[in-house]
């Protein structure tokens, strides 16, 4: 069964792509956060703020899963946000988070999220941010990155995932970042917990480590294919039949592979024909820069590019990374329905 998912937040209006308003509908389904500066400057209130945010965010994740789980089966896929637990890997807070009573409470409040996802058939994932660089040449950066990745593995473990290879399709997605390349990444992989190794998925990058590089680790972990990144990297509209795409499928060892999809921003490619795929070579010749073209669109404005993305839908689940979140995924789903 095809699945089409979105990332992290539920939007009710296109204006919310620029950030959720304080009085927005569904604040309870979206996460809250604070800053390390606020926590430092309000020491007497800091622990209570941490408790409030962790409880809100676990509850929000459950509500998100339940809402996605009430959608038609092909829409039951969502990425959960990384900012669930504030400062989990920060030196000033790491000991607090590792206290047994805190860990026990986290397991208690996150377990219902995983239970609901499995009951409702919702595929979940995480995506640590750009500072998670598992192939860095600097060992201190790698150690910090391991902490960050294991933070996501802890949340997945509390939700009941990680005991087997991508159980229920769960993945923790990260780029193969760092000048150490595949060799350094594989050394780092051996330092991760069994749950983290079971759930890690490596994504091709748009500027440096493309598909040909990530395939070097395909025998050791699942790969995520980001087709927008690949287009930025190579100018190619790769097909599902491409041998490289088939190797990505094989890396999942029977689990359903995941694909990331977006398109260059509509305010960059202004007046581009919505029924014609952009040609990267022509755009570069006209003075466009990859640094601008790589940015994710708000919505899936180019139907020709979406038609291409949908050629993968038979064998892949598609995660929409457009800033329009669920609203952008509505567009993808409707275009898919029109083809049925």
Range-by-range predicted roles:
Residues 142-222, 228:
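Eukaryote-skewed repeat-based solenoidal scaffolds used as protein-protein interaction platforms
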């Amino acid at each position: 069964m095809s699945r089409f998912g979105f990332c992290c937040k539920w939007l009710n209006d296109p204006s919310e792509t620029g950030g959720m308003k304080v009085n927005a509908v569904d604040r309870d389904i979206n996460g809250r956060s604070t800053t390390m500066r606020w926590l430092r400057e309000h020491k007497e209130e800091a622990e209570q703020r941490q408790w409030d945010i962790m409880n809100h965010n676990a509850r929000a994740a459950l509500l998100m899963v339940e809402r996605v789980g009430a959608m038609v089966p092909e829409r039951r896929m969502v990425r959960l946000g990384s900012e669930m637990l504030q400062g989990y890997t920060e030196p000033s807070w790491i000991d607090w988070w590792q206290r047994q009573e805190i860990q026990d409470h986290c397991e208690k409040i996150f377990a219902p999220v995983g239970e609901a996802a499995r009951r409702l058939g919702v595929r979940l994932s995480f995506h640590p941010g750009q500072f998670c660089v598992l192939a860095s040449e600097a060992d201190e950066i790698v150690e910090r990155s391991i902490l960050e990745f294991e933070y996501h593995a802890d949340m997945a473990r509390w939700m009941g995932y990680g005991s087997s290879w991508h159980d229920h399709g769960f993945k923790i997605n990260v780029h193969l970042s760092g000048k150490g390349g595949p060799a350094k990444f594989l050394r780092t992989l051996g330092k991760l917990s069994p749950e983290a190794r079971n759930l890690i998925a490596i994504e091709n990058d748009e500027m440096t480590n493309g598909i040909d590089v990530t395939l070097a680790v395909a025998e050791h972990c699942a790969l995520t294919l980001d087709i927008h990144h690949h287009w930025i990297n190579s100018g190619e509209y790769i097909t599902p039949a491409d041998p490289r795409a088939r190797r990505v499928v094989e890396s999942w060892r029977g689990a359903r592979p995941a694909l990331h999809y977006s398109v260059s921003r509509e305010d960059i490619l202004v007046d581009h024909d919505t029924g014609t795929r952009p040609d990267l070579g022509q755009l570069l010749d006209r003075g466009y820069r990859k640094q601008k073209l790589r940015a994710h669109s708000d919505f899936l404005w180019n139907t020709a590019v979406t038609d291409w993305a949908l050629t993968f839908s038979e064998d892949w689940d598609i995660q929409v990374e457009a800033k329009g979140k669920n609203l952008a995924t509505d567009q993808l789903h409707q275009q898919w329905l029109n083809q049925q």
